A protein has these predicted regions:
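Helix-rich effector regions associated with P-loop NTPase G domains
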Residues: 1-12, 18, 39, 45, ...
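A structural signal for isolated positions on well-ordered beta-strands in alpha/beta enzyme cores
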Residues: 12-13, 82
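Canonical P-loop GTPase G-domain recognition
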Residues: 19-85, 204-207, 213, 217
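Conserved protein kinase catalytic core
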Residues: 22-23, 50, 102, 135-138
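Alpha-helical scaffold segments in soluble metabolic enzymes
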Residues: 53, 57, 93, 97, ...
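Short coil/loop residues immediately preceding or within conserved phosphate-binding loops
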Residues: 76-78, 101, 116
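Glycine-rich phosphate-binding P-loop
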Residues: 80-100, 130
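Conserved P-loop NTPase mechanochemical-coupling segment
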Residues: 95-106, 201
């Protein structure tokens, strides 16, 4: 659908929340996107120089268009761009930072932006803010688990146990040292998932009557620690798996 709407127009991809993602994976993604003919940039939506970082690839992406306009004697105008992304990736935070005032609602839950609006961004750009969009159906269930871990899907529409299990298995395979250090546990690559839950529950003191592990608290803890990047800088979509 988006490919049909965008057509042959220049496309800029902004990888937000780079401070919460694996730096090495971000670099791989930037290189991959460049090879695809896309103009990418990795940013932290709250950083002070955000406008320059976003403006640079946008100007580069539209350079040929404005050169043709100049040859025809057409006065240059502001670049108009539509901002499109999944919910809760920080689009509104970026827009407010660029505009230097609160023009878009923000929140750590999906679906905060409800309407479209044009935002002036410096002297070179005008940005159309749009509500977050998602696929109507996920062909691969793993996509939904990954999106849930970023907060793009509301918690009441997913199985949080499955989300936490996916997160722990991913970290067990790719970030074992960080997982052990953060929760002060001692697991290895062969540890069964239920034993990982038990280890975290014992370490954090999440117990119910009868000294039973409170798995619901462990589940919530793992999910929110992952979303807040407390365990480490994680990237769930690995460039090597493209």
């Amino acid at each position: 659908m988006l490919d049909h709407v965008i057509g042959d127009k220049p496309r800029v991809v902004i990888l937000n929340k780079k401070d919460m993602a694996s730096q090495s994976e971000t670099d791989k993604w930037l290189n991959h996107l460049k090879r695809q003919g896309v103009y990418p940039a990795a940013v932290n939506g709250k950083e002070p120089n955000i406008l320059k970082k976003i403006e640079a690839p946008v100007v580069e992406a539209t350079r040929e268009i404005f050169q043709r306009m100049e040859k025809k004697g057409i006065n240059p105008r502001a670049i108009r761009a539509m901002i499109v992304g999944i919910p809760n990736v920080g689009k509104s935070t970026i827009i407010n930072n660029i505009a230097k005032r609160k023009v878009a609602k923000t929140g750590n839950t999906p679906g905060v932006t409800k309407a479209q609006q044009w935002i002036k961004a410096g002297t070179k750009m005008e940005l159309l803010d749009t509500p977050g969009v998602l696929w109507p159906k996920f062909e691969d269930p793993e996509i939904g688990l990954k999106l849930s871990l970023t907060g793009a899907i509301k918690d009441n529409v997913v199985n949080l146990d499955e989300v936490a299990i996916f997160a722990l298995k991913f970290m067990q395979e790719h970030h074992l040292a960080e997982l052990n250090k953060f929760y002060n546990i001692n697991i290895d690559s062969t540890t069964e998932i239920v034993d990982i839950f038990d280890a975290i529950g014992n370490s954090r003191g999440f117990k119910m009557s009868g000294n039973e592990i409170d798995y619901e608290r462990v589940t919530e803890k793992v999910i929110y620690d992952t979303r807040d990047a407390k365990i480490g800088q994680l990237t769930f979509d690995l460039a090597e798996e493209i």
